[in-house]
């Protein structure tokens, strides 16, 4: 299974991914972490972004071939990036689950302020980055579950698991894996 967790910075994607990974026995590939491993002081150029996503997709493909569940955790704010995820799931003949994380802007701002005080956080995204990506975000159009991460974590995880079960049942009824 391939799970795409997309959304703006500060919307709780990594928290959802980490907890969901435990339930699905999945490996989480965080674009923030991969970026920091490739570029200790990233410039966020298009070339850097392309390499980060290329490496992310290569690792995901390797894990899917090994029949592992994979969670992709990143903004995936461009339709073209998400299209690559859809193509990967199709090529690997695996189920694709899409989770869109959102949160009220005031909550995001508060999270960003708290995040700025912490050490060893793999993301450099601050509220200015949030606003920039918000303005460039291309809406998701595929079937997905949308979770407001200002709601309790357990409620969101339960909603996601219900969605996964419903997509699994629908795929079985139609004779498809994904």
Task: Please place each PLM-identified region on the residue numbering.
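Hydrophobic anchor at the beta1->P-loop junction of P-loop NTPases
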Residues: 5
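Small-molecule kinase domains that catalyze NTP-dependent phosphoryl transfer to phosphate-bearing small molecules
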Residues: 117-159
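Conserved phosphate-donor/acceptor-positioning beta-strand/loop module used by diverse small-molecule
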Residues: 92-112, 147
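Walker A (P-loop) ATP-phosphate-binding motif of ABC ATPase nucleotide-binding domains
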Residues: 2
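The conserved Walker
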Residues: 9
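Glycine-rich phosphate-binding loop used to anchor ATP phosphates in small-molecule kinases
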Residues: 51-96
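Conserved glycine(s) of the Walker
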Residues: 12
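Conserved substrate/cofactor phosphate-moiety recognition/catalytic segment
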Residues: 15-66
């Amino acid at each position: 299974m391939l799970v795409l967790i997309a959304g703006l910075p500060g919307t709780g994607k990594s928290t959802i991914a980490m907890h969901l990974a435990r339930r699905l026995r999945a490996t989480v590939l965080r674009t923030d972490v991969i970026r920091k491993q490739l570029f200790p002081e990233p410039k966020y150029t298009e070339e850097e972004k392309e390499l980060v996503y290329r490496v992310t997709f290569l690792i995901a493909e390797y894990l899917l071939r090994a029949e592992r569940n994979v969670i992709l955790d990143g903004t995936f704010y461009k339709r073209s990036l998400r299209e690559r995820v859809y193509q990967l799931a199709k090529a690997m003949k695996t189920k694709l689950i899409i989770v869109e994380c959102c949160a009220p802007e005031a909550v995001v701002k508060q999270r960003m302020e708290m995040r700025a005080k912490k050490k060893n956080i793999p993301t450099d995204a601050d509220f200015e980055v949030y606003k920039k990506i918000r303005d460039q975000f291309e809406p998701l159009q595929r079937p997905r579950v949308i979770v407001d991460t200002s709601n309790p974590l357990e409620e969101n995880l339960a909603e996601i698991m219900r969605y996964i079960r419903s997509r699994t049942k629908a795929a079985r009824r139609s004779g498809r894996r994904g």
